[in-house]
Amino acid sequence: MNDLRKETDSLGEVNVPADKLWGAQTQRSLEHFSIGRDLMPREMIQSYAILKKAAANANYAGGRLDGKIHKLIVHTCDEILAGQHHDMFPLHVWMTGSGTQFNMNVNEVISNRCCQLAGTALGSKLPVHPNDHVNMSQSSNDSFPSAMYIAAAMNVTQRLVPAVEALHDAIAAKSNQWDDIVKIGRTHMQDATPLTLGQEWSGYAAMLADGLARIDDALKGVFRLALGGTAVGTGINAAPGFAEAVAAEIARLTGLPFVSAPNKFAVQGAHDALVQLSGTLRTLAGSLYKIANDIRLLSCGPRAGFAELRIPENEPGSSIMPGKVNPTQAEALTMIAVQVMANDVAVGFGGAGGYLEMNVYKPLIIHNIAQSVTILTDGCTNFRTFLVEGTEPNRKKIKEYVERSLMLVTALAPVIGYDKASRIAHYAMDNDLTLKSAALKLGFVTEPEFDRIVDPAKMVKPYVAEIKVPLAIGAKTG
């Protein structure tokens, strides 16, 4: 059995494992809220270390924090930022809605590590007290949401955005490479007029670019921090100027444009900026779902489907059917998209859970956003690396579909009229003819007219056929 030590808080003594850096309040949370397997996101450990370091710097600069205590706190925060002590943050997501227990977990770990560095006993709170020093000028009610915003912003800008940009660039490169491949378009899952494969993929690239722009716009609100609002947004126990100073310090430490929120009541009673950010993740997920499904559909086959695209073989596709290749990267990405959409529903409900001066669904919100960002990042990277970059067109099959398509008749409509063009398409279908054969049999155009007007390469951009020679008998309506 592990040795224990006594730690104290306002409720009395608590037994804590002797080798752990956390204190009484963390231990109480472990005993009362060990629910499920979801731990607080690792990103929150890092963001809180940044926040506590910035607060110590601001309090020291403001003359409120002793120099030796300041150095101990900063040193410990730097250790955490370097990846040390992460096993000292064991709390589960499903705790108090304010995140107070996690804030105290951070305060206690920093305090006890400072005690170790100073050569004093764990739990002595000397020379660094978890509340008086580490939590100086703060409340859980403003520090936890600020840590949420820092974690979300860093995770999005440092991980998700580069991953989406790389996927966008890979798709855009394919679009440019395939701009000369004319293929048949499809609407309602039925044949439509032609476009190029490059144009089709340019749409995918544009969707991702738009998604990145939406995320960038949403981040503007996430950069506004609650820190300095303390308990209810008034700033009680925070010195004048602390809010602005600590936000500037966080901006310096992260390289991101964090500022003090102009109205602390709004960002402590609600977290609309994170709800908006989650909405942009949901929109991105919807785009990825469409892109993955399109590629999955166009690659279906190889002999009884569209088979317009050849996708890489990641692994054997079946335990019973030899030689089968499945679009597993597309399937994985669509599952990720569904999970992100579900997470957004939770974030939306959580964001609405602001009662009076404080939102009480904070851990739920950051848990779901952190998961969404992580799986979107990894999903985009895998989809690019193991599918997009290795995908190739089946030019023979694409050409065959274009030549067989009845919807090329659309180019004839401005010349012979919609009704006659429709008759050609139906006649070709009913008699198993090519479009050209049907048009000539009905006598609506001559062969030279058909060849000039019905040119798939012309139809991939704005194009209206002109009448340059007398039309065949019966071509004009009336």
Swiss-Prot record:
The record marks E331 as: Important for catalytic activity. GO terms for biological process: fumarate metabolic process; malate metabolic process; tricarboxylic acid cycle. Keywords: Cytoplasm, Lyase, Tricarboxylic acid cycle. It comes from the Bacteria. Its main location: cytoplasm. Substrate binds at residues 98-100, 129-132, 139-141, 187, 319, 324-326. The keyword tRNA processing does not apply. GO terms for molecular function: fumarate hydratase activity. GO terms for cellular component: cytoplasm. Belongs to the class-II fumarase/aspartase family. Fumarase subfamily. Involved in the TCA cycle. Catalyzes the stereospecific interconversion of fumarate to L-malate. Homotetramer. This is Fumarate hydratase class II 1. It comes from Bradyrhizobium diazoefficiens (strain JCM 10833 / BCRC 13528 / IAM 13628 / NBRC 14792 / USDA 110).
